[in-house]
C-alpha cells in the first residue's frame, strides 16, 4: 500500500511539474518579426514554375502556387503564394499540387497582403511518430515507460522554457547548464526509483561525473582554442541583436549537457546492480558492494563510450565523405576545428562516463548497505521485543 502511494505520488509530481513548465512564458512569444502575420496550413491547388531557373541541381527564382487556406481567420479562402528559391539545396523546397504547406500570411485587418510559402507541413507526421513511440514504450514498459515519457516531456520543456531563455538573457551558460543538468538528473532518476536511497546514490554518482566533465571540458575547450561559433546557427544569433552572448561558454555547457544522459543511464545501471547484490547478500560490506558496482561499470563503459562516438559522429557523415572525396590528409582532418570540436565532445563525454562508474559504485555501496543494515537492526529489535 505504501509503495503504491509512493509511486502514485511520483506520477502526480511529474504531471504537476509538466503543467507548471507549460504555463511558464519564455518571454519571446511576441517577437516583433511575427506581428501582423499568421502562420497557417494551406493546400496547394496548382503551381507555376515559369520563372524558376534550373542549373544542374540548383534552382533559383520564384515558384507561384494557388492555395486554399486551411486554418486561421482566412480559412477557406483561395489566394496566391510565392515560394522563393535561393539556389540552396539545404533550404529550398518545391511544392506539388495536393501538398499541404505551412505558409506565412501578411495581412492588414481582413485583407491579405502577401503569402510566403514557408515549408512543407510536417507537424501531423511528427505527432504521429511521437504517439507511436509513446504507445510502444508504454506497451512494453508499462508504468515505467509512462514515467519515461514524463521525464522526456519534462526535459524538453525545461530546456525550451528555462534554459534557452536564460541563455538568451545573458545568464552564465556554464553555471546555468550545471543547475539545469543537476535538476534534470535528480528528477529523472527520481521518476525511476521514487522516494528511495537509490535515487540519492545514482544522482550523486551522475552529478559527480557531470561536474568532472564540466571541468575537463572547460579546460580543453580553452586549450583547443575552439570558438562557440562552430555550433550550427550560433553565429546568426550575434547578427540578430545578441552580440553579448558568450558562444564559447554555451559550447562548453553543451559538452556536459550532451553527455549527461549517458551518465544517468550508467549511474542507474550500476545502482540497480549494487542494490540487487545487497538484496541477495544483506550482510555484504560497502567495499564489496562498491567492487561489484565497478565490475558492472567496466562492462558497460565500453559500449557507452562507443554510443557517444556514434551519436556525435552520425551528424558529420557528409563532412567526412567530403574530406575523403577531396583526399584531405588525416592530420588536416583531425586539426579542422569542426572535427576538433566533435573530438572534444566525444572524448570529454567519455571521461564523464569513465568517472561516473567509480563515483556511483562508491555512493551506492555506502548508501545502500547502510540502508540494509538499518533495516536489519530494526527487524532484530522487533524480534527481540
Go through the PLM ranges and name each one:
Residues 4-12, 197-210, 301-307:
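Alpha-helical transmembrane segments and their helix-start/interface "positive-inside/aromatic belt" motifs
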Residues 87-125:
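Extended, hydrophilic extramembrane loops/domains of integral membrane proteins
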Residues 260-320, 327:
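Helical hairpin unit composed of two closely spaced alpha helices linked by a short loop
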Residues 131-138, 143-238, 245-258:
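Transmembrane alpha-helical segments that form the functional core of multipass membrane systems
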Residues 295, 299-302, 311-385:
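Hydrophobic alpha-helical transmembrane segments of membrane transport and translocation systems
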Residues 1-37:
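Hydrophobic secretory-pathway targeting helix
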Residues 36-61, 101:
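Structural detector for short beta-strands of small beta-barrel domains
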Amino acid at each position: 500500500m505504501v509503495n503504491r502511494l509512493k509511486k502514485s505520488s511520483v506520477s502526480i509530481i511529474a504531471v504537476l511539474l509538466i503543467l507548471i513548465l507549460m504555463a511558464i512564458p519564455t518571454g519571446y512569444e511576441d517577437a516583433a518579426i511575427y506581428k501582423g502575420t499568421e502562420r497557417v496550413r494551406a493546400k496547394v491547388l496548382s503551381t507555376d514554375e515559369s520563372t524558376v531557373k534550373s542549373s544542374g541541381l540548383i534552382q533559383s527564382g520564384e515558384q507561384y502556387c494557388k492555395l486554399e487556406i486551411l486554418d486561421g481567420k482566412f480559412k477557406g479562402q483561395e489566394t496566391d503564394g510565392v515560394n522563393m528559391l535561393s539556389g540552396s539545396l539545404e533550404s529550398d523546397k518545391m511544392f506539388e499540387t495536393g501538398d499541404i504547406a505551412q505558409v506565412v500570411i501578411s495581412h492588414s485587418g481582413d485583407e491579405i497582403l502577401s503569402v510566403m510559402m514557408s515549408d512543407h507541413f510536417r507537424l501531423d507526421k511528427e505527432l504521429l511518430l511521437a504517439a507511436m513511440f509513446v504507445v510502444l514504450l508504454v506497451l512494453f514498459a508499462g508504468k515505467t515507460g509512462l514515467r519515461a515519457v514524463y521525464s522526456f516531456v519534462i526535459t524538453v520543456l525545461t530546456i525550451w522554457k528555462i534554459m534557452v531563455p536564460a541563455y538568451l538573457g545573458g545568464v552564465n551558460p556554464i553555471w546555468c547548464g550545471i543547475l539545469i543538468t543537476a535538476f534534470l538528473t535528480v528528477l529523472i532518476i527520481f521518476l525511476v526509483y521514487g522516494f528511495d536511497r537509490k535515487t540519492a546514490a545514482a544522482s550523486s554518482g551522475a552529478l559527480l561525473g557531470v561536474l568532472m566533465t564540466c571541468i575537463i571540458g572547460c579546460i580543453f575547450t580553452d586549450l583547443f582554442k575552439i570558438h562557440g561559433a562552430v555550433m550550427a546557427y550560433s553565429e546568426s544569433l550575434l547578427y540578430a541583436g545578441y552580440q553579448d552572448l558568450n558562444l564559447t561558454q554555451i559550447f562548453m555547457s553543451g559538452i556536459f549537457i550532451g553527455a549527461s544522459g549517458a551518465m544517468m543511464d550508467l549511474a542507474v545501471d550500476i545502482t540497480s546492480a549494487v542494490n540487487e547484490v545487497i538484496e541477495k547478500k544483506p550482510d555484504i560490506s560497502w567495499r564489496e558492494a562498491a567492487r561489484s558496482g565497478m565490475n558492472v561499470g567496466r562492462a558497460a563503459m565500453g559500449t557507452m563510450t562507443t554510443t557517444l562516438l556514434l551519436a556525435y559522429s552520425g551528424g558529420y557523415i557528409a563532412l567526412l565523405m567530403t574530406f575523403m572525396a577531396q583526399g584531405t590528409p588525416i592530420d588536416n582532418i583531425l586539426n579542422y576545428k569542426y572535427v576538433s570540436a566533435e573530438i572534444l565532445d566525444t572524448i570529454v563525454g567519455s571521461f564523464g562516463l569513465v568517472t561516473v562508474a567509480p563515483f556511483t559504485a562508491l555512493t551506492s555501496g555506502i548508501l545502500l548497505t547502510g540502508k540494509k543494515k538499518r533495516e536489519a537492526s530494526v527487524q532484530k529489535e522487533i524480534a527481540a521485543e
